[in-house]
Amino acid sequence: MAILRSKEIWDMEVDEIQDKLVELRAELSKNVSKSAAAGVIENPGKIRELKRTIARVLTILNEKQKEN
């Protein structure tokens, strides 16, 4: 999954953002468990980027909900 930029998230509806958040959390969980089981994953920076993207999504989601 591609990393989402702020502009892309702002252009989404709240329902879309929540769906994307579920997908990102599932992907993070999969990567963390793969890292714990195998010890080595293909792209170790992916976990960090997923965490940052989740934080970005949550921040924008909270701002959008405060606007309404």
UniProtKB/Swiss-Prot annotation:
The keyword Signal does not apply. One of its GO terms (cellular component) is ribosome. Keywords: Ribonucleoprotein, Ribosomal protein. GO terms for molecular function: structural constituent of ribosome. PROSITE patterns: RIBOSOMAL_L29. GO terms for biological process: translation. HAMAP family: Ribosomal_uL29. Belongs to the universal ribosomal protein uL29 family. This is Large ribosomal subunit protein uL29. It comes from Methanobrevibacter smithii (strain ATCC 35061 / DSM 861 / OCM 144 / PS).
